[in-house]
């Protein structure tokens, strides 16, 4: 039978929600009955010794696994008669489960069968029911079913708040699921009943260490981000003061083009700016990276080295041999990102392509009123005259 069939067609998430709501409702009923009992006592009447609401919890309605095919404990099983009390029957099932559990992982399913049988008796000894649940949780802990461990132990400690094994197993399962705060809370609850419990103290220490490690990593990340922002603000200020260069936020991850994620615009001791520049060839999804495009360098200076006119060297992707100096055009898009310095006023215009002449130096382009450096300068390289070129300029790509 599938999981959905066994749970009435519910998904795992829906089943978890149903379970959580049922436990909450049951706890509320317990509190209401406790209050009612106190009122009975105050009136000199006899309080209700126990309730049966817990018997309707989904945890007691799970489908049993198949009965063991070869049962070496059959004699003990057959000794159960109608004369036995529910508590005696449940204890016999539990003992059979314990025997199978001790035989190891190959018999875990058999052990589960008998722990489920013990629970299905629904005896009125809540201390015993607490043990059956925590025993079943022990098997699921070994099987890695941590969610089931938490469910069983949550009810187990409600049945018997002094069941230290249930606290321990629940805290370990929460630790395995990286629910460190929940694990600490579970340990604290158990330790409130038994302050000297070493197992719970150890689990709590481990959970707290994990939690502190996470907090430290998060704080380190925040500190690093703040430091980076301060560095960007300082660089943006210096660039703008230098020549109205407007440093902006990146428009996409540049590390795929620069091969170094920390590549950025720099200013040397002579106050000269060095631009790492990316040339994008949108027709083919290719790129070139220029590590140091100095302020007085023209675009032609670099393009002629990449596409020498006297001895053309065509890129492997340029099968039609269309990317030559006489056809290559360079473009940037206006206002494609926002400047880091919030006090810089940018003229709001519709985005458009601006062509850059080969003879223009990069300083003039970068200082253009509508050019904002997207972390590092980017320029688009296209070949004039073909179909892609027309679509590119029309923004129909």
Swiss-Prot record:
Gene Ontology BP terms: protein folding
GO cellular component assignments: nucleus
TPR repeats by residue range: 90-125, 130-163, 164-197
GO MF annotation list: Hsp70 protein binding; Hsp90 protein binding
Record-linked Gene3D superfamilies: Tetratricopeptide repeat domain
InterPro entries per record: Csn1/TTC4_wheel, TPR-like_helical_dom_sf, TPR_rpt
SMART domains linked to this entry: TPR (SM00028)
Keyword terms of this UniProt record: Repeat, TPR repeat
Similarity comment: Belongs to the TTC4 family.
Name the record gives this protein: Tetratricopeptide repeat protein 4 homolog
Organism expressing this protein natively: Dictyostelium discoideum (Social amoeba)
């Amino acid at each position: 039978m599938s999981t959905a069939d066994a749970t009435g067609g519910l998904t795992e998430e829906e089943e978890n929600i149903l379970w959580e709501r049922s436990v909450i409702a049951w706890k509320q009923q317990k509190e209401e009955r406790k209050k009612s009992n106190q009122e009975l006592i105050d009136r000199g009447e006899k309080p209700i010794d126990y309730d049966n609401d817990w018997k309707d919890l989904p945890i007691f309605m799970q489908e049993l696994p198949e009965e063991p095919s070869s049962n070496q404990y059959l004699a003990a099983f057959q000794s159960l008669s109608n004369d036995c009390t529910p508590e005696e029957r449940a204890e016999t099932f539990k003992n059979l489960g314990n025997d199978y559990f001790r035989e190891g992982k190959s018999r875990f399913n058999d052990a589960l069968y008998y722990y489920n049988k013990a629970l299905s008796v629904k005896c009125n000894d809540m201390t015993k029911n607490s043990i059956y649940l925590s025993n079943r949780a022990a098997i699921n802990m070994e099987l890695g079913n941590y969610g089931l461990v938490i469910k069983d132990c949550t009810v187990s400690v409600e049945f018997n708040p002094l069941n230290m094994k249930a606290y321990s197993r629940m805290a370990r399962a929460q630790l395995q699921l990286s629910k460190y705060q929940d694990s600490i809370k579970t340990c604290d609850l158990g330790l409130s009943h038994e302050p000297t419990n070493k197992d719970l103290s150890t689990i709590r220490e481990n959970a707290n260490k994990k939690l502190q490690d996470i907090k430290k990593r998060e704080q380190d990340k925040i500190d690093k981000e703040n430091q980076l922002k301060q560095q960007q603000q300082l660089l943006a200020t210096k660039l703008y003061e230098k020549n109205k260069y407007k440093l902006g936020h990146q428009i996409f991850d540049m590390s795929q083009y620069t091969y170094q994620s920390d590549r950025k615009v720099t200013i040397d001791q002579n106050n000269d700016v060095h631009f790492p520049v990316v040339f994008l060839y949108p027709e083919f999804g290719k790129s070139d990276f220029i590590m140091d495009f100095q302020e007085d360098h023209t675009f032609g200076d670099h393009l002629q080295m990449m596409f020498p006119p006297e001895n053309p060297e065509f890129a492997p992707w340029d099968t039609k041999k269309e990317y030559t100096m006489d056809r290559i055009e360079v473009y940037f898009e206006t206002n494609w990102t926002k400047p880091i310095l919030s006090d810089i006023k940018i003229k709001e215009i519709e985005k458009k392509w601006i062509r850059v002449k080969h003879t223009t130096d990069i300083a003039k382009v970068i200082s253009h009123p509508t050019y904002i450096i997207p972390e590092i300068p980017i320029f688009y390289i296209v070949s004039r005259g073909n179909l892609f070129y027309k679509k590119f300029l029309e923004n129909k790509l």
